[in-house]
Amino acid sequence: MPGLDPGIHVLDECSKEDVDGRNKSGHDEEGRGLPMPIRHRALWALAVILSLALLIAPALWNGFALLHWDSGGYLARWYEGTLEASRAVVYGLILTVGVPLSFWPVLLLQAAATLWLVALTLRAHGLGKRPLLLLGIIAALSVTTTLPWLTAILLTDIFAGLGVLALYLLLLRADALSRVERLGLIVLIALSAATHNATLAVLLGLLAAAAVLCLIDRRRMPLVRLGRGLAALVLGAVLLLSADFIVAKRLAWTPGGFTFLFGRMLQDGIVKKYLDQHCPDPALQLCAYKDQLPDNIDTWFWGSDLFDKLGRFAGLGTEMEKIALDSVIEYPALQSRTALVATAEQLIAVHTGDGLLATLWHTYAIVEKFTPQLVPAMRAARQQQGEISFTAINEMHYPLALIAMALLPVIVDWPGAKQFPP
């Protein structure tokens, strides 16, 4: 990947930002463009190989890619030729490409993207050309955080973090990047945005904040950098629509945004309040069942006979969207209060291993139906044998995650963090 080897970079002679930024950061004075000694190249190669191994270590130990409840939904998209709520077709196509080699290319892609971003971040902050430092940081993150459990699983969650970090580098550290590296970040941001509507929403929010900064101080946030961020998200939308068209043969956005907003409102009691006030209404199917609705989002979407009876997402999608949008307008104070409570609960729900179970019947069924050649390896994996436990892991990960979040205001207030690039 571009930028992983800090000794070799492309200098864009046409970009004044490149030249000025690199001179100020001192990278050119470090011997940019000069060939590295063989010993140093060997050290980099060793650091990269060991780092990649650490990032997929859980899968190596497991004997197969780690699986989640959602993994089967992604994999099924190409084979079923349909769109499913919050199951990104882009990621499903990536999984399909990885099938012949038992998904190992997918895990390596996720690990390589992570390693590249960490290396790029170190160099952008003046800590490049240190292969052992890179290896040490990857090792520390692999032991003390959930990172390798995200890079070693067939799930889009890893791209949420990668997308945010990539956007940060593109917007605020562009002076330390070559044109090739910026293009690589744009592609990675686009891919991240296309893997989940929630990730796209977060990236849009961050870009909006950058736009405000651009209006206030063009020196800190030049318009050209804002344009790159916007281009990345537009490319993400194009990727999403193109993949959906290839698979479903129609131009459509991956469904699920409003339906899962409905699910949160259902869990918070807002849907019950809405139905109590608006029923009877012949336009609302749920009026006839308002006293039978569960108060848990997972039960409603994945374990409710009533939801199945009413046609699931296809049959109730429009109605759930209407209720969700109307409820936002009618109960703004209640929405704000419940959203704040849900946010607080999510911030402390940071245990490692959520959804990594041995009873993933839907994912197992999808693998058995569409990729039967992978079933023996999948069934023999430690996860499917019930050998994975996160009790001891979370005794370390959980408090460290809370401490890290508590220290965030301190880090933000750290003098070095306030130095924006010119």
Give the predicted meaning of each segment.
Residues 182-196, 232-236, 240:
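Membrane-interface alpha helices of multi-pass inner-membrane proteins
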Residues 104-128, 139, 143, 162, ...:
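Transmembrane-helix motifs of polytopic, lipid-linked glycan transferases
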Residues 149-159:
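Short acidic/glycine- and proline-prone juxtamembrane loop motifs at membrane-interface regions
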Residues 61-75, 82-101, 316:
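Extracytoplasmic catalytic/substrate-binding loops of multi-pass membrane glycan-assembly enzymes
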Residues 120, 159-176, 184-189, 206-207:
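Specific aromatic-rich, kink-prone transmembrane helix
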Residues 89-93, 100-119, 134-136, 150:
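Loop-to-helix entry region of an early transmembrane alpha helix in multi-pass inner-membrane enzymes
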Residues 43, 97-109, 338-421:
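Membrane-interface anchor segments at the N-terminal boundary of transmembrane helices
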Residues 253-371:
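Membrane-proximal stem/loop segments at transmembrane-domain junctions that anchor or position
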